[in-house]
Amino acid sequence: MNKAFIVVAVVLLILGIISFNLVFIILAIISLFFVDPQIMRKFYKFFLKSNISKIFVKNYKTNHSIVIEDGYLKIEDNVKAFLIVDDIPFDYRDLSDESLRVKISSFHKVLDIAGQIDIVFRKSSIDKNKFLSDLFQKAQNIRVIIDADPSNERAKNELMMIQHMIKKISEGEMPFKYLIFFIINSDSKEKALATADVVKKGLESIGVKSRLAYKHEIEDLLNDKLSLKKIVFPSQIPFLSVFSLQKQPDYEIITDGIYLGQEINDRRAVFWNVNRVINPHALIIGPTGSGKTEFLLSLGVKTNILYGIPIVFFDVKKDISLRLKKYGYKYKYINPLLNSINLLKFSNVNKDIYLIQLENIIRNSFKLDRFVSALLYRILLESISDNYYEVSWDYIIDKIEKYDINEDVKAYLLRIVSAIKSLDAGVEDIDLISAISEGINVVDLSSIKSEELRRLVMYGIIIKFINKYNIADDRLKLVLVIDEAWTLLRSEDRDYQIVADLIKRGRGFGIGIFMATQNFDDLGELSDIFLENIGLLGFMNNGDKKFWNEVMRFADLNIEETLRSLIFLGKGEMLIRFINDPRPIMIKTDVLVRNSF
């Protein structure tokens, strides 16, 4: 019986080598196993050491047209895309049991996208003492950097990470080198690479950075010549621990730029990279006492320090200037009662376009109806056409008085223009726009008691800067900061947009706008435009369930998490969401303290 199996095994082996058919080889091995398991083991060693295996593999590759390029391998109609893991910047031990249970399915959901997927994990140990020595040296170098520049938040964050790694080693967790491949199977190159891209983005959402493998990396994997370079701890490998982390926005957006604060769950530093987003605007919504003004102040000051661009605060309650003094920051004080906006003077823009802008400013400031607004536009047009170089509000008042219109309408227009005249002196040598410095500027609106005139000042400054910086580039040149933004946003409608148009244009005007208000109703009828186009959207603590139900339209939240966590956010804690990415983050905001820079 044994001889029969040996004869069969030899015949099958010969057929397999001649025809390059793997089925015959497998059957031969099975036949040998029935004869004697030791024979099979000896044959396996012989097969691997001999040239037979090399000849077989070589001919199999030739016979089946294997193609290896960056990102994929093709064998006839079977295509495999290769993703390689670059970084796993987290630790699951920072999560609570409940958070871990909630997030456990995310990793598997990402893998389910690909249908059939293989994971290759290679691991090797490292010299712990040498690794520790390198960490101590790096920590020492970073401390020198921080001593020279105490405002360097990125260096502080890196030092914190190194100290955390040293602590892990001291607790007995051994680091190791690793390499991880995700292999996606498909029937075409296009489908394989497209699926790999979707998986890559899904992995990024749980904090895992990956990329398509290069051709030589795929070849090294197949030839078992891979060199392991990345170093991690056991608690950083989610695939072996069967868990996932919370979804996070694009890695490049939250790891560089303006320091916003620490993530509440894992205390990781969160940044806002204004240069990487398509829209440099921010809107913070929260009730009185939630900490939105402090955060807005911090955001504006940090933007000026980090990017070196002018920041203009509109100070409605005089609390901005008081807080800046309290924290020891120098700023330029600008009083619109002393520095004129010069609304009747314009440059860098066509006359007809500016007249439309001026009509929009006055219409939105005084909430004029269509008839009165159209009549005012006609009067402005005739006044400037009659007296282009010397037009004044007095001239326009005379024009209105001579106009053959309804007396009530005439009185209404005279009241509006007289109010504008009282504020807009039109003296060029004290021009408000020219008074704006390159640093921090505070426009004091607290001395203006009329909401209409406050809006006039803010709208006038916005339009003047839009015309000044209306150059086709993506560079951020100025940021306007508006606390109590409801004063502007409620007055806009779909036909006469100023702030909404600025926000929709993204970086187009070169102007960023940071705003804070108390609730969704403050945004007026254009609320969807503001919420859908804002680059950084923040929601602060609010016990109203209706409020959080509205938030769920713009952020990817589940009901349980909302009820258990968000309603009980403390002062200075906030849920943030970046544009075009519904994945939210809960942070403890970083605010100014005296000499914080």
From Swiss-Prot:
GO molecular function: ATP binding; ATP hydrolysis activity
Pfam family, one: AAA_10
Principal place of residence: membrane
Keywords: ATP-binding, Cell membrane, Membrane, Nucleotide-binding, Transmembrane, Transmembrane helix, Transport
InterPro entries named in the record: AAA+_ATPase, Ced-DNA_import, P-loop_NTPase, T4SS_component
Induction trigger: Up-regulated upon UV stress.
Disruption phenotype: DNA transfer is completely abolished in deletion mutants. Deletion does not reduce cellular aggregation induced by UV stress.
Membrane topology: Single-pass membrane protein
Membrane found in the keyword field: yes
Stretches that traverse the bilayer: 10-30
UniProt subcellular location: Cell membrane
Highest rank taxon of the organism: Archaea
GO cellular component, one term: plasma membrane
Outcome following mutation: residue 292 to A: Abolishes DNA transfer
Keyword Ribonucleoprotein part of the UniProt annotation: no
Binding-site residues for ATP, renumbered to this chain: 286-293
Biological role stated in the UniProt entry: Part of the Ced system, which is involved in DNA import.
Protein name: DNA import protein CedB
Species: Sulfolobus acidocaldarius (strain ATCC 33909 / DSM 639 / JCM 8929 / NBRC 15157 / NCIMB 11770)
